[in-house]
UniProtKB/Swiss-Prot annotation:
Organism name: Saccharomyces cerevisiae (strain ATCC 204508 / S288c)
SMART domains membership: HhH2, XPGI, XPGN
GO CC annotations on file: nucleotide-excision repair factor 3 complex; nucleus
Protein name: DNA repair protein RAD2
GO molecular function: DNA endonuclease activity; metal ion binding; single-stranded DNA binding; single-stranded DNA endodeoxyribonuclease activity
Function comment: Single-stranded DNA endonuclease involved in excision repair of DNA damaged with UV light, bulky adducts, or cross-linking agents. Essential for the incision step of excision-repair.
PANTHER family: DNA REPAIR PROTEIN COMPLEMENTING XP-G CELLS-RELATED, DNA REPAIR PROTEIN RAD2
NCBIfam families noted in UniProt: rad2
Binding-site residues, Mg(2+) 1: D30, D77, E792, E794
GO biological process, alphabetically ordered: nucleotide-excision repair; transcription by RNA polymerase II
Amino acid sequence: MGVHSFWDIAGPTARPVRLESLEDKRMAVDASIWIYQFLKAVRDQEGNAVKNSHITGFFRRICKLLYFGIRPVFVFDGGVPVLKRETIRQRKERRQGKRESAKSTARKLLALQLQNGSNDNVKNSTPSSGSSVQIFKPQDEWDLPDIPGFKYDKEDARVNSNKTFEKLMNSINGDGLEDIDLDTINPASAEFEELPKATQYLILSSLRLKSRLRMGYSKEQLETIFPNSMDFSRFQIDMVKRRNFFTQKLINTTGFQDGGASKLNEEVINRISGQKSKEYKLTKTNNGWILGLGANDGSDAQKAIVIDDKDAGALVKQLDSNAEDGDVLRWDDLEDNSLKIVRHESSNATTAPQKRSNRSEDEGCDSDECEWEEVELKPKNVKFVEDFSLKAARLPYMGQSLNNAGSKSFLDKRHDQASPSKTTPTMRISRISVEDDDEDYLKQIEEIEMMEAVQLSKMEKKPEADDKSKIAKPVTSKGTEARPPIVQYGLLGAQPDSKQPYHVTNLNSKSESVIKRTSKTVLSEFRPPSQQEDKGAILTEGEQNLNFISHKIPQFDFNNENSLLFQKNTESNVSQEATKEKSPIPEMPSWFSSTASQQLYNPYNTTNFVEDKNVRNEQESGAETTNKGSSYELLTGLNATEILERESEKESSNDENKDDDLEVLSEELFEDVPTKSQISKEAEDNDSRKVESINKEHRKPLIFDYDFSEDEEDNIVENMIKEQEEFDTFKNTTLSTSAERNVAENAFVEDELFEQQMKDKRDSDEVTMDMIKEVQELLSRFGIPYITAPMEAEAQCAELLQLNLVDGIITDDSDVFLFGGTKIYKNMFHEKNYVEFYDAESILKLLGLDRKNMIELAQLLGSDYTNGLKGMGPVSSIEVIAEFGNLKNFKDWYNNGQFDKRKQETENKFEKDLRKKLVNNEIILDDDFPSVMVYDAYMRPEVDHDTTPFVWGVPDLDMLRSFMKTQLGWPHEKSDEILIPLIRDVNKRKKKGKQKRINEFFPREYISGDKKLNTSKRISTATGKLKKRKM
C-alpha cells in the first residue's frame, strides 16, 4: 500500500509519458501488489472474489507490456520484516472483525429482504373494494406443478458424454455379437427358444443393458426425437416394460425361477438341484466343448443324443436333393406352426440383389414370361404375440433429425438399410399357429415348395444395373383364397389415438417386395445345426442359431460432420435432401432444452478480460454452410491411426498457411512461434498434475499482505474499472480484433447494507501462496524473468534500479520512494498511450521533499511499518514537516507546551489549531517517536545485491495455450486471438528498428522545462517553506 495519501502529495509532479518511448526499456515490476489489486477489485455481482482473476489480469498486462516492447522483470515479496509483521497482526485482528461484520450485515440484509417480501405479499393479498368473492376450488392431489425447464452443466463429471455412451454401447456387442443386430431379435419368438441357453443368456443380458441406457441416445438426440414430453414419458415406460420382460426371461433361462415368460410356448425350465455326490464338467469333442448332464451327453458316437424326430433325416436329404436339382420353391408352402418374422422393407429400397449360385441364373427368365403355379391357400387360426425386440420400441424414426440434434446417432442400427424416402418403421406382430405339432413335418415339405416359387420372383433381366429392386409379378387366379393379412402397427400405432395409419401386408399382394436369395442359401438357413456341422461349418452352435434369425448389420450411414470417419462426396445426395424436407426437425420444448447449460451464470465471465466473437461466428457460419447440401461416406479400410494422421495433416497445412507471417527477427526477444495444433502431451500432463496438486494442497493465506484504507481500496476498484475499459479499446484498435462484451459491473445495489456487505467480503480475502505459484508459472511460459526478494519487493526494485539492472520501476506502491526508488511509472494500464512518470529529482525540486522527509511523512500518515498519528492527513503532515523541519522538533514542541499555558498563548494560529486537533484525537508522543527502527527499515532494507544481468526468453505459444486451457478453460483459438496478433506486431516493430529520440541527446530538464504545480494554497505554502529549507 505504501504511505497513506502520498500519491495525493506527489501527484502534481507526475508527467505523462508515451508508452512508445518505453520501447526496449528494462522495467522492474512489483508483482505482489498486482495480485492484491486483482483480489480486491475483481468481484462478481455478489461481492465474492472471482476465481483465477489474477491469472487473467497478469496475462492481459503482460501482453500489453510486450506489445509496446517493454522488457519486464517481476519481483515478488519474500520474507516479512519485524515491523511489518506487527502491522500484519493488527490488520488480521481488523480482518477478523470484518468477517464477523460481513455475517452480521448478511443477516440484516436477509431480514430486510424478508420484510420487503412479506409487505408485498400482504399488499397483493388485500382485496379491492369492488372485487367479487372468490370461490374456493380444491386442487387435484395428483396435479403436478409446471416445470419451465432444468439446467445442467455439460462439464459436470456426473453427466455421461456421448463418447462414454458410444464406448459402453460398443462394449455390449463385444462378446461374439458384433455382426448381430440385437434390435431385431424378439426374445418372445419360438426361434429364440430354439437357441442354446448360453446364447439366450448372452442376448438377454445385452438387451437388458441396452434398454437401461436409453438405447444410447444423448440428451440432444432425445430432444429432437421427442419434442413432446408425453411421448418421451411413454418411451421411458415402454423401456421399463421391456427391461422387466428381459429380466424375467433371463431368470427363467438361467433356471432360477419356473414359469413366467418361458410359458409362451408352454415350456417350463426346471432348475437343476445341486447334490454333494454329483458333479458337472465340460467334455471336449470334435466340435467344441459340451456340458455333460446325463448319460447320453453327445461326447462320442456311443453316447449320442437321441432325437425324437425320426423323419428329420429324411427331410434334410430331400431338401438337399431339391437344392441340387434346382427345384422351384413355393412361398405358400412355408406356413407351419413355428414363428415367422415379417421384415418390413421400404418399397423404394435399394438393396442389391444377391447373386444366384444355381443354374437358374444361366437360363434366366423374364418377369413377364414367368407364371406362377396356382396354390390353394388355407386360412388358419392365428394368434398374435407382441414383439419384444428393441426395434419395435416406442421410438419414432429419426433420420436426419438425429444428426442435426448435435451428436451422431452411433446406435441407430434399426434403420441402417436406409432408402432415399424412408417410411415409418413398423412393429412386427408374430403369428403362431394353434394347430397340433404333429403336422409340422408335413408343412415343412410345403414350405420347401413355396421357397422354390420365391426363386421365380427373384429372376430379373438386370439385377445390378438399376437402383431400385424390381418386383416379380405373380399370376394368381381369382378363385384363390386370400391369406389372412399380417397386421403391422407403427411405433406409435399401438396407441388408440395415434394418427398414423395401420400398415397391412398381404403375402399375395403384387407390390410386395421380395429379397432375392438362392435355394441353397435358404436351405442352409433351415437346415438343422447338426447337418451344418457335417458340412464342415466353422461357426459355433450359438452363432449358427443367431444367424438363423438375424442378418448382419449393414454399414452405418452417418451424416455427422464432426466425425473423423467421414469425408465429403463430390456429388450431392438428392435423396437425402428429399428426406430432410419430409422429416422436419421438431422444435425442442423449453423443459427439455440444452441451452440452459450455456446460459448458466459463470463467475469467470464477470471480469470479461478477453473475449472475441469473430472466431466463434466464423465457426458457426461454417458449420451452417457445410450442413447444407453436403453428404459424407464412410472411410473403410483405414485404422484409427491413419485417420488421425489425415486429419492432422489437414490441420497442420491450414495452420501453416495461417501463421506464415510469424517469422524470427531476433533471437534476443522472439523467435519462430510454433502455431501448429500439436501441443505436447507432456505439457498438458504437467499442467493437469500441477492443478491437481494445487487443488489438493490447503490454500493457506500468506503472511504478508497490504493494508489499504477504505478510500484507497475504493480507488483500486475504480482504477480496475478504468483499466478494463481501456483494455477493451486497446484490444479492439491495437490488436485489430472484434469488440468484446463489456464488463458486467456491480449489479443492482439494493441498499446500503448490500454495499457494506460487499466491502466486508473484500476486506476478508487474502492472497495465498498458490496464487503466486500460478503467476510465476505463467511468467516462465512467457519467457519473462522473475525473482523473489529477500524481504520487500519494492526495496528490491529500488536496489535493481540503483545497480543499473533496470531502467525504471512499475508499481503503485509509494513505499518505493522511501526505499530509494527514483524513476517510477504508475497507472501503466489506465490510459491507452500514456503513463504517469514520477522522478525523485522532480519531487525534490518541485515539493522540496527528499528521502528523509518522505520517511517522516510515513510516520505521520502511516505505512506498512507504522500506524501513523490519528487525525493527520496529507496537508497537515506536510505542513508539520515544513513548519518544524523534522519530527524531533515537532515532538519537542508538542510535549513542552502540553502543560505550559504561557507557551500556548504565544503560539500562532497554525500551532493552536494543530495542538487542538492532536489533543482531541488523544495523541501521545512518547520517547519512541520518531521511531529509529522505522527509519532504519527504509534506509537499510534487506535486499539482494547480485549484479548478474537478466535474460529474456521467448514466449512458448503451445505452453501458454495449454496453461490457459488448464487454468481458465480457454480453447486454443481464444488464446491465439491475443497471442498471434501480439507476436506479429512485435516482430513487425522489431524489423523496422528503433527510432532515436531527442531526449537521448539532450538532458531531460532542457526539454521539459519548469512545470507549474496545480496544488492547493496550503500545500503550496508548505512546499515553499520546504524548498527554502533545502536552499
